[in-house]
Structure formats: structure tokens, C-alpha cells
């Protein structure tokens, strides 16, 4: 357990990188062009320290380009880290196919006696509690999830680590969490996380139907009443609780303030980036201007 999804993401990526540094192998990391800021900022740090970070291109609908991913992988690639559900668009990435690709690469490297291992990390923060997550089908080595996304207490998150995967800890001390994360364990927050997960399991199907019904109404009513409204992602490839919309002839912040006066909450970007009045990297990667 960790304190946040940001910490889990950092532990996953830095932990893999640092545990293999002594062998001087694995200088290439691959991620997508629409990751959370905790991944993007970390990738910038990796590049400053001599690592090559390759980013997978996106389709116009926001899905990762699997053909491009195959092209980016080389014998020095040590880690692939991809967000499961995008926090801005809600797109669900085809990560079972990525997991299968990683399995094939391992088999190929074994045959060719390539010493660099390859790991697969999934940032499932937005997927957790919204869609079914099957670790075996995903074939991932590491997976991030957190409490507050399922209405549990803030300050608790997890990092799933596949048996046999070695991580160098970020925090050194008393050897808590099997030596991976030293620090006094936040038992109340973790218990709340567990309880929220229990409740979530029983409510997930009901909530999915509720969100789908609301999403369908929004997608029907808005175009009927407003000209120049566009839904950036088809509903069949996203979670229904996230809708990404753009409008002609109105500035984003003005729309946010106007809707707020009517007690309707919207955002011009993710919670982590909405304070910065810059274009969304995720939407730019989809070809939107």
C-alpha cells in the first residue's frame, strides 16, 4: 500500500529502473502520449537522467496505436507503462493485447538470449471500480489503483506487484511493506480503502448502467439544443462516467463559470491540469487542434 496513485506510479517505474541499473541494461521506457501527469513528469525526469522515453501515437478516437507500439520496442526496452482508462476522455485502452505482446517479446528474448527483461505497468486509477479488471488476462507485472476514485478515504493507494518482480524502494527505513515501502502504514485509510472496494464490487454494475443512461441523455440532448457541439470520443470505447465535449464559439473558462452558476460541475481538463490554461496533450495526440 502507498499514499497515492502518484506514489504508486513512481514506485513502479523508478523501482524497476533502479533495480536494473547495476546491470547497465534497459535504458528505454515506452508510454503513451496521453498519460497522467504523474507519469509524464516522471518521464521528463528519466530523460534528464539519460533514459530514452518513447511515446506511442494515438488514433483519432484516442486508442493507442498498437502497430506503432510494436515499432517502438527494441532490445533495450525495459518497461511499458500505459494508462488503462484516460482521466480526460474515458477511453479504455486495449491492454490485454499489450499484455500478450509483452509475453511474446519475453519468449523471443529468451530464444535470442537477450538479457534485458521487459515489464508491463498499468495505471488503472480511473479504471478501478468502473470496469472489471482481470490481472491474469492483462498479463501485467505492476498495476496502480487508489482509494478516493472509489469514494474511499484520500491518502491510500495500492501497487500490485507480480510475484518475482523486484523493485528498488523509493523510501528507505524500517522495511515496511515487505521492504518495498518503509513508513508507518496508514491502517485507518487502508481499512477505509478495503471497505470502499467491498461496497464498490456490489454497486459497480448498477452504477455503470446509471452512468450509461446519463451519458446517453447528454449525447442526445446537447446536439438537439446547441449547434457546434462535438463528442471527442465514441461511447463504445470509453467508460460512461467520463464525457469529453468541445463547443464552437465559446471559451472554456467562460463556460465553466456559467455552468457553475447553474450548479453544474464541469472542467476544462483533468483535476491535475485544470489550473493550467494550456491545451490538452491527450486531445492534441488525437489530432484535435
Stretch-by-stretch model annotation:
Residues 1-289:
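Pyridoxal 5′-phosphate
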